[in-house]
């Protein structure tokens, strides 16, 4: 599958397609049609695993017993004589009647252990199961099963997704869980062990389970939990549009400087930064220096010139980092700042070189692609890392990136303006020995770092954590900063980076008009959806309240089924209206914040049993009750965004009028 990284460019697939052709030609020589078909299908999911299975030699650890019944397949460990199943056919039948029936409404299910594959083949006859994720710890069992049971159709459609646990990483699980169906059904997550045979892999099971739990937590956190924060971002982004369009263009800068430097040093503000500053000053002329916003005052104090300063925060407090002018120290630096930054930050940075950038979220829908996209994750540290990647550095070095408290309790380097609130979470220490105290937010930053680093490691980029303290960041090479700088700058010339010009007047006018039209259409469509939701809410809310009152009295019965079904149909029509393609691009972001947590609860309700009429009645009562809050929340969110956008777009309207564009 093509993977989009942070510059919004799809990774080239030519080499992958060539490998697929070569692989298919080789695999097609396999006599066993079942194994051949399975490997070809698996290759589209996991090239490395498919190749490992193809090249696997003699099987030594297991024996296979096949009875008269085609599903009577058992696998026995030769050393321990433990059986995968006691009685394969009846065990699988019991699993289908038990877990299969219990979870028959689950769109997504997770299992540890592939077994003989028959259970999953049967389970996927239920079309409700959109995806079944299976993690198998033993390569030989994978090999045996894919030789015996044809799962090619299920693998090719990705209704069955197989991971080999030895190759499985947090980044892979995170990339899986950011998918829409996985994130919505996060609260239904349960990691089922296939059979007791797999109990001997308990440590591995726990490791993979932690990956899923971390990934789910990261995905939920990325949705945010505050409409107020979202509205502040909308307000700031809309107010900043004229400056974004008239200022330096992000893609122009990337094209001009891509591949010019080999090494980037990202400067964070952890307590370990103090000891690295002298080394950084010495080697700064030979590397790209990317300063986080909070690091700028510290670098200025020590006379270190940054090449880029990144910032992603929307609050006014961040603007204080840019208040002081640093003369020659930052006159040539480009301030790469998310467009949702506070307008005061824009004022404080100017007239220095400001590049406002769009994040790969709701801003994509405006079509101002030259100004994006940068800033996946919750931190400007993640933004800086993604910038270093997009600029095509071969080496990315982190310093001051403690993501943990120092032994003396300090959370930041000397000279940093803000302290970190107390929390008692612990993570593996730098060097892998012991633990250090961290925070929930820092842990989420670290998760994003590790996901990005795993992706770039595969592309041949070397990632160094030269913080020499704080938390371990998996995937990085831990080395002393001075040693890494000496190695990477040996024989390098002083850097001499070219600058870019402002966009021409024609482009500015075109994009201002484009932004204006988008904002007007957005307001119009949001008002249409809001009106529809309010109408339906006012119509169904009294009926829902009545049904809930009856339920709470214990008087809900089968006779209420038709009424609840009628309410549900009205709600469904409202959701279908809001989900129309023409509205979706304009309301998707406010939708994701306003009702995401209701959607998580609705997903839980949707998988509850409803085999009898009374079960259906109780389930529908829960369903309509949650949708009352859903309708109210989204209508309220839209109303707030409409008002915010109208007020914030005054700058843009003034600009287009001044230029005679409307």
Annotate the PLM regions.
Residues 2-264, 271-288, 297-301, 308, ...:
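N-terminal donor/sugar-recognition subdomains of glycan-related enzymes
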Residues 136, 295-296, 303-313, 388-415:
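Glycine-rich phosphate/pyrophosphate-binding loops
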Residues 149-151, 305-308, 313, 325, ...:
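Short secondary-structure boundary/capping segments
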Residues 267, 283-286, 290, 310-312, ...:
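Alpha-helix capping and helix-loop boundary segments enriched in small/acidic/polar residues
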